[in-house]
Amino acid sequence: MVEVFGIPIIAASKFADSGKLNHVASIMAELLDQDSDGCADDPNVLRNILIKSKGKVRPALVLPNKSVTKAASNAMKEKGFHYGQDLSFGEVLPKCSGLKFTTTCSDSSIEEQFHFITSFGHSRAYGQIFGTHWVDTSNLTKAMDIARYFLGFNFPY
């Protein structure tokens, strides 16, 4: 396990041995600190990511070999973490990141971590704008309804 700004990234040993854990951690750091000054660009987003759910556990980015098992999920809860987002070994392809991305070679590290930061950070910190729950009527969900042509229907996305 490593932490980036206090956010736990819990990884199977295969990740650490391959160097992929460092790749994922550096992307998390870049997403939260884009000006590279050593501080999260939006402390409100970081604070909300670090909030413990029900006062007991905090979300973690999980890097399993294949998928998160029930036993692994329970072990994380016992240590004070809960599964927030996963990123499997096969999805992390540093050789295919950035300008090396192609339609047949892509690294999912940015996308999956963006989901994590959005779900636990932006949507909590700025719910009126970035709320993502089914019952939210945030600017984001309204824009999603428009993009998916749900206007005039009582069926929000």
Predicted regions, residues:
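Acidic/His-rich structured neighborhood in mature extracellular/periplasmic domains
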Residues: 4-156
